[in-house]
């Protein structure tokens, strides 16, 4: 079982799949055992409840759904899950190491 679970949410859950791969690679290179996955924003309620996938230790929104931050932040707070929006530059450049570091900062 993974030490930490990092969930990413975007419009369809597909555009973040490459970023997830890069984050997994960065985690492995640093000896971290994280489960990292991406889903659609439609799955946020289930993710925060741990239904259908492990409850995340942190939730990151893709920049294309940043407008949802206020709504999601309320739900995440109730669930006890820190969340934030991925920086557009890191997302656009697919900087898995930077996004992983941001997730780790939120978990600490």
Curated annotation (Swiss-Prot):
This is PTS system galactose-specific EIIB component. Residues 3-108 form the PTS EIIB type-3 domain. It comes from the Bacteria. Transmembrane segments: none annotated. It is an enzyme of class 2 (transferase). Keywords: Kinase, Phosphoprotein, Phosphotransferase system, Sugar transport, Transferase, Transport. The phosphoenolpyruvate-dependent sugar phosphotransferase system (sugar PTS), a major carbohydrate active transport system, catalyzes the phosphorylation of incoming sugar substrates concomitantly with their translocation across the cell membrane. Involved in galactose transport with PtcA and Lmg_0963. Its EC number is 2.7.1.204. The modification Phosphocysteine is found at residue 10. The active site is at 10 (phosphocysteine intermediate). The lineage of its organism: Bacteria, Bacillati, Bacillota, Bacilli, Lactobacillales. CDD domains: PTS_IIB_chitobiose_lichenan. One of its GO terms (biological process) is phosphoenolpyruvate-dependent sugar phosphotransferase system. The keyword Phosphoprotein applies.
């Amino acid at each position: 079982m993974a030490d930490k679970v990092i969930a990413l949410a975007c419009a369809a859950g597909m555009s973040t799949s490459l970023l997830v791969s890069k984050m997994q690679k960065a985690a492995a290179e640093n000896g971290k055992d994280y489960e990292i996955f991406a889903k659609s924003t439609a799955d946020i309620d289930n993710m925060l409840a741990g239904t259908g996938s492990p409850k995340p230790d942190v939730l990151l929104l893709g920049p294309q759904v940043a407008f949802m931050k206020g709504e999601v932040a309320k739900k995440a707070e109730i669930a006890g899950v820190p969340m934030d929006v991925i920086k557009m530059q890191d997302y656009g450049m697919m900087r898995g190491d930077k996004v992983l570091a941001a997730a780790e900062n939120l978990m600490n």
